[in-house]
């Protein structure tokens, strides 16, 4: 039985396009956009430069294609996690679990999104720019008891940035070996930390 296709590859994609997408994501995650050339992608994929140009006008369009698909997947998984639960504590746990699970299951995707957002975000389609991770974090924080009480003790934007930033930075710390993975092992500690921040 063949391995399942990564989510960023469509089952209708021809073999060359599949390998080009796989190779591109790997290289973009490992080296970054600027340090990855068309020649690198061709070499890694086993296909020629002209094969790449049959599927994408250039490296920038290929990178943007991957960025939009990967961001949409990340956002959908985390949005579904929030929607699946009732109440702040359950939503927080589901959101953290979804994010950490994605990091463990798709580390190259999260590395690519993090490293390339500054360059690709402004060029992304309107749906991607509307469906932000910080927007999901704000939605989550809006459910927190201290935020709902409107006491002013917790700033919603600062709390959302703290949650999203901590999740992203933990992934980076695991990536560079500053802390041990898997990411899922941090779930309870992070939920406790975030509850202390806003609950």
Stretches found by the model and what they are:
Residues 5-8, 15, 19, 23, ...:
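Helix-turn-helix
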Residues 63-70, 113:
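Alpha-helical DNA-contacting segments of helix-turn-helix folds
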Residues 65, 79-105, 159-163:
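Hydrophobic alpha-helical connector segments
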Residues 19, 90, 94, 98, ...:
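Amphipathic alpha-helical interaction segments
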Residues 101-105, 109, 139, 143, ...:
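Amphipathic C-terminal alpha-helical segment
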Residues 100-139, 149, 176:
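Short secondary-structure transition hinges
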Residues 30-34, 85, 106, 147:
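Short coil/turn segments at alpha/beta junctions that flank glycine-rich nucleotide-binding fingerprints
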Residues 72-75, 122-147, 157-161, 184, ...:
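Amphipathic alpha-helical packing segments from all-alpha helical-bundle domains
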């Amino acid at each position: 039985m063949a391995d399942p296709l990564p989510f960023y590859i469509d089952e209708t994609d021809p073999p060359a396009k599949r390998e080009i997408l796989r190779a591109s994501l790997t290289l973009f995650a490992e080296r970054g956009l600027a340090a990855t050339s068309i020649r690198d992608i061709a070499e890694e994929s086993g296909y020629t430069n002209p094969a790449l140009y049959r599927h994408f006008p250039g490296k920038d369009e290929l990178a943007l294609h991957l960025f939009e698909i990967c961001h949409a997947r990340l956002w959908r998984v985390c949005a579904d996690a929030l929607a699946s639960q009732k109440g702040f504590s359950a939503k927080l746990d589901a959101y953290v679990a979804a994010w950490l699970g994605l990091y463990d299951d798709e580390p190259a995707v999260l590395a690519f999104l993090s490293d390339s957002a500054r360059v690709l975000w402004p060029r992304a389609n309107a749906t991607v720019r509307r469906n932000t991770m910080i927007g999901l974090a704000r939605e989550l924080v809006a459910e927190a008891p201290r935020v709902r009480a409107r006491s002013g003790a917790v700033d919603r934007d600062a709390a959302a940035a703290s949650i999203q930033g901590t999740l992203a930075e933990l992934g980076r710390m695991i990536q560079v070996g500053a802390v041990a993975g898997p990411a899922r092992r941090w779930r309870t500690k992070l939920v406790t930390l975030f509850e202390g921040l806003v609950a």
